[in-house]
Regions:
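Non-catalytic, solvent-exposed segments at the cell envelope interface
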Residues: 1-205
């Protein structure tokens, strides 16, 4: 959420494993039913691109009791190395858990992520550890807020200038350039990240 008066942004992070009603679509993008499934599957249950983004936004809105959502911005993780390096790298402080991704990620050390290391930082999770997605979600918040802070340091219009070469390749959004640049003018309160109440449980084998 964005407070236009204080210029502060607060993040609501929703677990990809959240079980909810997912709309299903045929090959033309027309809705034909619903299933109870993980939130992350909504994109795949549509036809891709902007239509899948719209479907995901619609599902999230219903999950949040029809809370208004002003737009969507979807980034393919495959584009992280290029976008990251276009900014000259993104610096984050490492935790003890991050050493599992790369031994160079020492706890307490600030590391400027470059190339594939940036992608691995936001994508990695140990599939042998139950609920390892929680740690990945925490890293993703740290990374995205650091990326926006870096973009802001380059000037008011840096964020859109940064991503514009990658719009067709890695990004789907219904936001225009001015709206995207406005996002980089906010201070994001990473110590106040909200999430949905719930419990992560193992599914049936």
């Amino acid at each position: 959420s964005l407070d236009k008066e204080t210029k502060e942004g607060r993040i609501l992070q929703i677990n990809r494993n959240t079980m909810t009603q997912i709309d299903t679509y045929d090959s033309t993008g027309s809705a034909f039913g619903t299933v109870n499934a993980q939130l992350a599957t909504q994109y795949a249950y549509c036809i891709g691109g902007s239509r899948s983004c719209w479907a995901t936004e619609k599902t999230v809105k219903k999950l949040l009791y029809n809370l208004p959502i002003s737009g969507y911005f979807a980034l393919s993780v495959d584009g992280i190395p290029e976008i990251n390096d276009a900014l000259g790298g993104v610096t984050v402080e490492m935790t003890e858990e991050d050493a599992a991704i790369n031994p160079a990620f020492e706890a307490g050390k600030e590391v400027c992520l470059k190339g594939a290391d940036a992608e691995n930082y936001v994508r990695y999770r140990d599939t042998n550890v139950f609920n390892s997605n929680e740690g990945r979600m925490q890293r993703q918040v740290k990374y995205v807020t650091a990326l926006i802070k870096n973009a802001r340091s380059h000037g008011g219009s840096a964020l859109y200038n940064l991503i514009s070469p990658f719009l067709d390749k890695y990004i789907e959004t219904d936001l225009d350039g001015d709206q995207i640049d406005a996002l980089s003018s906010y201070t994001y309160l990473t110590d106040e990240v909200a999430d949905l109440p719930g419990e992560t449980v193992r599914g049936e084998e």
